[in-house]
């Protein structure tokens, strides 16, 4: 038998074996939910109500596989609150906060989309990229730190949690230059830029150094408290059981902190499951005196997190 033929047979056997293995896993993963799981689903759906039904459908889906893509539609850049802006794509958002000391970015998007998405989006909102003083990265993946080096080279500081600085430095070489190690975020130690203090909360699971942020925002004469959970798991199949358990603990820890700090504005860096597009549309049509759709209220925010925690627990139970 010729060597090429033998290699071809081995390759076919590997493909068939791999396909069979994935088929078996899929069949196992789609087995009917147990009575216990159905009970938790019903409880979580009740927590979701109508306002967080999108969150429930996304996270409690059987075999969720929808992740963000770099070619998802670009959103119309928007001023969400008096000092809070959003730029990016429907699945990967960059948030800009104006302070008395300059602009702070939460994440910096894809590195190869600076000139096509982030910078023109900022300019459309009247935000000068040269005034970016800090970039705070929610977690150490390239769709979040991609543009950070650009701003760092122009004088901005870059903030990442310690474990994710390690992750960034170990990232394989590619076309996107990562930022150089700079400020290390620490749980509960505020990062104050001008008149705004950002409180980091460690939420490991998606990455070892995933981080949430709590900070004040302006809503007319009212000060609101915004929260961004910077390490959402979109496709739980990528995590081990221990990783899922750690993530659930992180969501619950985040819930405790945000309840104590009275977070009432909900935003995400992967806004695929929180009515983001609906809220942007309502914001665009909002008339003077009408409530801001991003101000969800403290109780509603906790229900949102209850759905995240409940659905992730469901996904873990489905593996048993």
Sequence positions of predicted segments:
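Positively charged n-region of N-terminal signal peptides that target proteins for export
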Residues: 1-4
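Bacterial N-terminal signal peptides
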Residues: 8-21
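Accessory terminal helices/loops
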Residues: 15, 24-70, 220-223, 231-320
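Active-site HxH/HxHxD metal-binding segment of metal-dependent hydrolases
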Residues: 31-42, 46-48, 112-116, 120-190, ...
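Metallo-beta-lactamase
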Residues: 63-64, 73-74, 79-82, 131, ...
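Conserved beta-strand hairpin/beta-sheet module of binuclear metal-dependent hydrolase folds
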Residues: 70-125, 129, 212-234
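Active-site neighborhood of phospho(di)ester-bond hydrolases with catalytic His/Asp-centered motifs
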Residues: 106-108, 133-141, 159-161, 203-205, ...
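Active-site environment of divalent metal-dependent phosphoester hydrolases
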Residues: 113, 140-146, 166-168, 208-211, ...
